[in-house]
């Protein structure tokens, strides 16, 4: 059975890799010079024996190239800077190392729900020299908050990128910040291949263009990753657009007054794993009130309910009836 599972995973990797090639091809079927770059993030590292570790990449044949993207917040740790791995270049016929493309896809799929974040963040097509793209990214990673204050944001991480794509303001900013990029492909939490098409080619990045709502979504990402980990451990399939669904659940937890991290995570787990309306059942509402009043944790209050009530809460949710109990979620 284990061999069959590994074979199925390999088949999925190859299918997604082929889908990526087909997604990229319309941008490459031109006489204009085009590069295809994979973005690696050593801040979410891989083991030294991993074939995508830079020490292993240096041993590949044919030789491959990569360029660092300077991070002002990691000046003393250049080994953590993002790397732009060149997969295709105008002066080469076809892919420089086609198995390497397959390897990046397999890695992105395997790490998509990791609590530690993605190492392979995406693939971009550009008509600009990779060194120019690295300089653009360096500038765009620093967000101006005020005249004197800047904040770094690793917006290229797939989870963060997916949230930015849900914001019209953020999409407009990224189109400006990444002028010269025609396409950005990434794999989301559910394992789906996505593509962002860029239009407009303004020259200078727009500093500080993200709204307060965009920043709030980004600040919830660490909690969202804990929700993803718990859902994965509970063997719950992540829905399409999981990044947005989880963020909306965490935001709703804020609105309802849930302060403790444990309560917020419990609320989000039920919202995604059972259904977004679960908290509207009177018994669920009472449990939430117990948590906000400090009488008990949300998980303990829910676990005190009988099976029939839990079943009715699941029906209220309108999604997956009776999938998991609170204890199973939080184990």
Locate the predicted segments by residue:
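A contiguous, surface-oriented mixed alpha/beta subdomain in the mid-to-C-terminal portion of proteins
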Residues: 2-61, 68-70, 79, 84, ...
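Hydrophobic, conserved cores of late-appearing folded domains
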Residues: 75-89, 108-113
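A glycine-rich, hydrophobic loop/mini-helix early in the fold
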Residues: 90, 95-112
């Amino acid at each position: 059975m284990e061999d069959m599972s590994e074979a199925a995973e390999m088949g999925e990797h190859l299918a997604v890799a082929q889908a990526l090639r087909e997604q990229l091809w319309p941008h490459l079927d031109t006489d204009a010079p085009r590069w295809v770059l994979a973005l690696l993030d050593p801040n979410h590292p891989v083991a030294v024996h991993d074939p995508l570790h830079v020490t292993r990449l240096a041993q590949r044949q044919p030789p491959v190239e990569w360029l660092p993207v300077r991070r002002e917040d990691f000046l003393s740790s250049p080994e953590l800077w993002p790397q732009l791995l060149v997969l295709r270049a105008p002066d080469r016929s076809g892919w420089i190392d086609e198995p390497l493309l397959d390897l990046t896809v397999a890695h992105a799929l395997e790490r998509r729900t990791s609590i530690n974040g993605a190492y392979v963040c995406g693939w971009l097509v550009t008509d600009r020299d990779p060194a120019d793209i690295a300089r653009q990214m360096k500038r765009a990673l620093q967000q101006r908050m005020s005249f004197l204050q800047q904040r770094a944001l690793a917006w290229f991480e797939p989870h963060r990128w997916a949230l930015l794509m849900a914001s019209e303001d953020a999409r407009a900013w990224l189109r400006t910040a990444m002028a010269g990029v025609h396409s950005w492909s990434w794999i989301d939490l559910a394992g789906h291949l996505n593509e962002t098409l860029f239009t407009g080619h303004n020259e200078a990045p727009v500093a500080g263009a993200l709204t307060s709502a965009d920043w709030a979504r980004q600040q919830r990402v660490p909690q969202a990753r804990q929700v993803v980990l718990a859902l994965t451990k509970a063997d719950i399939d992540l829905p399409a657009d999981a990044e947005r669904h989880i963020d909306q659940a965490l935001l709703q937890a804020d609105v309802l007054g849930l302060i403790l991290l444990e309560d917020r995570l419990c609320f989000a787990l039920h919202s995604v794993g059972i259904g977004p309306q679960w908290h509207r059942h009177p018994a669920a509402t009472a449990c939430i009130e117990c948590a906000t009043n400090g009488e008990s944790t949300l998980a303990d209050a829910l676990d005190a309910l009988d099976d029939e009530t839990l079943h009715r809460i699941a029906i209220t949710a309108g999604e997956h009836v009776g999938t998991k109990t609170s204890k199973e979620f939080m184990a």
